[in-house]
Each structure stands twice: as C-alpha cells, then as structure tokens.
C-alpha cells in the first residue's frame, strides 16, 4: 500500500449467515458476505476495494462483531463507511463501527483472540422461530457433564480431534482461554474464547458435547477424545445454524472496541 495516497480502515460488521454462502467470494456470483461488502464499499469509495477479514465464516455461520480492514484513496468520514455503506448492503449485513487505523494494521494477523458463541435448542420439536438462529437436538441434555467436559478444553492443546479434514491451519495447537456453558429456558449457550480456532472446531466441539449431555459419551471419554488427536473417532460435525462469531480482540493501541454480545443472543 502507498501510505502517501491510501488510508487503511477497520470496520466491524454483523451478518446473518443463513442468507449467504459464507464469507469468501466465490465464482459464479453466489451471494457471499465479502462480495456484498466489497460492492457496497466500492460505491462509497468510487473505486474497487479489497477486504481482509479477521476470520472467514462458513455458510450459515453468523457474526455479531466481525472485523475487516481495507485500503482506499477515497477520503471519507467514518459515518460514510457506516451509514453510506449500509445503504448499499443487502438485508442481512450491517456495518456497526468504522475507524481509520495505522497502515500496518492487519485484521487477521493482529488479532490476539476470537470469541464464539454456539446457541443450541434442546427440545422434542424444533421451534420454527429459531430455525437458522440456533442449532437443535431433540435429545434431553444433562448440563452438568457437558460443563465438566467443556472445562477440559481450557489451555494450550492439540485440537486435531475437532479439526475439519480440509483445515488449512499450519498447526492444530491452539489455546482456549475460556469455555463456559450455560442453560436457560431450553437454550444452551457455549461461549469459547481462544487465540485462534481450527476449521469447524467449534461445531465439532458442540457435536461432542451433545454426545456427552445425552449420555452417549462420558466426560472421561471426551477427555480421551482430545488426547486421541484424531477426527476419526469423534462425533459428527454439528449444524452451523447456532454458531456466532461474537468478537475479535486486538491490542489496545489500535482502538478497536469489541461490542457486547446482543442481549437477544
């Protein structure tokens, strides 16, 4: 980037993943978050704009606080990158915040942590009002064992047992700082905070925790599964519907504030 001519901006956005085929642009013009965002940014900038995201999300996965950076020669106030861009975005995406950042800022590589929430409905019949908003199981779940199993995730570990076959991460070793599991009104919430996550890692963890909660896998079996470091013996990947990227952490010098998780979630 020519810093004499271009500015670097960081924006925080929220999106409904059920409306898009994931974050990344794809051939054939299928709707993706990146394609829609870059089209809207270009309308305000008056030039093509390329975006870099903190963490790519799959089809059906939502975000309440995704972070993206882009470079532009256009001189615009922050509100232009919020209200102006939102006026050109399709339903299902909204820019929440915009901030000019240092030229060396990188949305992905400067991130020190990421936060995910999985929202799970446990009920005999799936609520039509929660379709695409929460995962679902008809099984009755015992939250106690699920909490004990989730606690085993904390720390630096090899998470190969929860890694997708096509994962491109250089190493399966990641650090989980916090793993909290709560239940209220038939909804289970799994909150994970880690330095980084493998492809499908949260959905694979949730799949295993559902096995624990339904009695198909013991807490000891969950611990053994982690130590196996193999996807072959692990439960199936859980549905994307209930997965939300809820925040990305950065050093304070960048001034990027992580929004609170919405109360409805």
Swiss-Prot record:
The lineage of its organism: Bacteria, Pseudomonadati, Pseudomonadota, Betaproteobacteria, Neisseriales. Its EC number is 5.4.99.12. This is tRNA pseudouridine synthase A. SUPFAM superfamilies: Pseudouridine synthase. Pfam families: PseudoU_synth_1 (PF01416). It comes from the Bacteria. CDD domains: PseudoU_synth_EcTruA. The gene is truA. Substrate binds at residue 116. Disulfide bonds: none annotated. InterPro entries: PsdUridine_synth_cat_dom_sf (IPR020103), PsdUridine_synth_TruA (IPR001406), PsdUridine_synth_TruA_a/b_dom (IPR020097), PsdUridine_synth_TruA_C (IPR020095), TruA/RsuA/RluB/E/F_N (IPR020094). The active site is at residue 58. Homodimer. GO terms for molecular function: RNA binding; tRNA pseudouridine(38-40) synthase activity. It catalyses: uridine(38/39/40) in tRNA = pseudouridine(38/39/40) in tRNA. GO terms for biological process: tRNA pseudouridine synthesis. PANTHER family: PSEUDOURIDYLATE SYNTHASE, TRNA PSEUDOURIDINE SYNTHASE-LIKE 1. Belongs to the tRNA pseudouridine synthase TruA family. HAMAP family: TruA. Keywords: Isomerase, tRNA processing. Formation of pseudouridine at positions 38, 39 and 40 in the anticodon stem and loop of transfer RNAs. The keyword tRNA processing applies.
């Amino acid at each position: 980037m020519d810093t004499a001519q271009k500015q670097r901006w960081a924006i925080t956005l929220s999106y409904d993943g059920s409306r898009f085929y994931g974050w990344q642009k794809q051939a054939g013009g299928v709707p993706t978050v990146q394609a829609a965002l870059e089209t809207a940014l270009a309308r305000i900038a008056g030039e093509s704009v390329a975006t870099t995201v903190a963490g790519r999300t799959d089809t059906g996965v939502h975000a309440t606080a995704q972070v993206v950076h882009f470079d532009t020669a256009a001189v615009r106030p922050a509100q232009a990158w919020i209200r102006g861009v939102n006026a050109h975005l399709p339903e299902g995406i909204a820019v929440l915040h915009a901030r000019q950042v240092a030229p060396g800022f990188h949305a992905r590589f400067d991130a020190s942590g990421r936060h995910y929430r999985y929202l799970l409905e446990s009920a005999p019949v799936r609520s039509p009002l929660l379709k695409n908003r929460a995962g679902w199981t008809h099984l009755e779940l015992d939250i106690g064992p699920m909490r004990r199993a989730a606690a085993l995730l904390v720390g630096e570990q090899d998470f190969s047992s929860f890694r997708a076959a096509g994962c491109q991460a250089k190493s399966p070793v990641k650090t989980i700082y916090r793993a909290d599991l709560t239940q209220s009104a038939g909804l289970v919430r799994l909150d994970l905070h880690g330095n980084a996550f493998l492809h499908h890692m949260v959905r694979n963890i949730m799949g295993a925790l559902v096995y624990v909660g339904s009695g198909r896998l013991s807490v000891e079996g969950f611990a053994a599964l982690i130590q196996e470091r193999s996807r072959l013996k692990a439960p199936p990947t859980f549905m994307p519907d209930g997965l939300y990227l809820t925040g990305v952490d950065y050093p304070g010098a960048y001034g990027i504030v992580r929004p609170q998780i919405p109360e409805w979630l």
